[in-house]
Amino acid sequence: MVRDGQVVDSFYSLIQPEPNYYNYWCQRVHGISQDDTDDAPVFSKVWQQLEERIAEVYFSDQELDDIRYQIATLPYVAHNARFDEGCLKAVFKVYQMDYPDYRFYDTLTASRRQFGQSLPNHQLHTVAAACGYDLQNHHHALADAEACAAIALYLL
C-alpha cells in the first residue's frame, strides 16, 4: 500500500481457488499448485483481511463498517488493469460479494504513453527495469505488486 508517495504496507496470501481447480498453463506461469493452497484461506477471508489492513493504513480512526465505502474510493493500480479487474469482478461474483466501482489505474497504459516504442515490450519486468526497479520473482503476486507500485510512483 502506498501513502504519500511511499510504500507503507504490504500483504500477501495464497488463496484456495473455488472450485479447487488448477489450470496447467496458469500453474506454469506462477508455479502455484494445489499442494501450495490446500491450507490457504478462500478469497472472501483474504479480502476481509485486506480490508482490515487498508483500514489500518488509511482510516485507522474509523470503524470498519463505516469505511467500506471509503475503501472503495481508493485508487487501485495494476499492470494491465483490465485483466486484473476482470479477475477481481469474477471472484467477487463467485463469492456473491458486492463489487464496488473500484477506480483502477493502469501502469501498462501509462508505460505505453510514457515510453512508446522506446521499449522492446511493455511487460511488467521490462517497464519496471525502465523505471529503475529490479523485479525479482516475476509472477509472484507480492513481487509483481511491489514492482507495479514502483512503476506507478515513477509514471503516474
What label would you give each PLM region?
Residues Y105-N121:
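Short alpha-helix plus adjacent loop in nuclease-associated cores
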Residues F92:
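Conserved hydrophobic residues forming the short capping helix/wall of the S-adenosyl-L-methionine
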Residues D98-Y105:
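Short hydrophobic/aromatic-enriched beta-strand-loop microsegments
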Residues M1-K89, D101, N121, H125, ...:
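Conserved non-catalytic scaffold segment of RNase H-like nuclease domains
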Residues A128-A130, A149-L156:
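Acidic two-metal-ion nuclease catalytic site recognized across multiple nuclease folds
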Residues F83, H140-L153:
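Acidic, divalent-metal-coordinating active-site segment for phosphoryl/phosphodiester hydrolysis
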